Amino acid sequence: MTKKFFPVVRSVWIGLVLFTFSVFMICGCSKKQKAADNTAQKVVRINYQTGTLCAAPVHIAMKKGLFEEELAKIGQKAEYVNVVEGGPTLAELIGSGKVDAGYGLYATQLQAIENGLPISYTSGIHTGCTKYYVRADSDIQSVKDLRGKKIGVPGLADSSVMNLKRKLLDVGIGVTADNNEVEFLAYSSSDLAIALNNGAVDVIGAHDPVATRGELAYGFRKILDTGTDEKFVHEYCCQQFVTHKLLKENPEGAAAVTRALQKASAFVEAEPVEAARIQIENNLVSGDLDFNSKLLDELDFIPSRSLGKKTFEAAAKQLQVAGILKAETDIEKFVKTGYIELPGVPDGYIYDSEKGKYIEITEPRA
């Protein structure tokens, strides 16, 4: 063996040692990074609105710490995103990745979901809350008399439009593009009652508390109430949703916020006066305690995943007939992806006021 060979061997040996050390350091850093990622506390961003009485479940879940409690069980926490009138819409906040979960009028988002809004619903929260009025001197007696009429609504994609179109279909009044026998006009919620009173429209559709306040202030006559009408009385108007990103990256968080909102809804059902007090005292909703609590008491806040899905499916099928959803949309697939069952989430809850405990509803309500 020549002397020249030893430097070569030595160089190779040193190179192997350095390579092995580098691999060890990279693996060690990678493991540390993964450990840091695993221990980092995840945050679920939840939308809420002020001024909306039937948003009571979200308000209660926030103020009674139900979101924090459920998320803390899995080492996570909640943050809240206020959706304000005149600002970015809920759909825009979802699309820009600023909201992970929340609650609202599900029918308002059906077209957006069909067009790619990445959310799925996980539970029905409450029924009712949308009402339709005419002036006291109007010759309109029911939905059957609405052919050729102007209808004021909070928005052309609002659930008040979707619900009424379904009802109009039932009584034979055209609502499709090629046979449209009514005209919907959009107004801000605060201007709806004025528009009806001034004769700019023949009918208005509004959500409480705006609806009932307008009725009392102007003496309007109610022709349809989704809280009592036989078609809608067992259908949810407001439902819980989660984004597809949350479902993919944090399914445990999605389940936690769903349970929290179900519990909060059950609390409102059992304690409407206390729920109204919490809303007013925290400046989440204005108004009188007696007035607000009576409106909450009129609504059905018993949550249900099964009945929520049944509601979603019924609306999707009929709104396709109405031309709201595309004729080529596969409704079965639309429902399957638009409404999901999360592991660890019961069908719903009831709240035992005497014991201060939440009891799981295991049997499907639908």
Report residues per predicted region:
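Short, well-ordered beta-strand elements
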Residues: 39-55, 76-82, 120, 148-152, ...
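Pocket-lining segment of extracytoplasmic ligand-binding domains
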Residues: 107, 138, 178-181, 185, ...
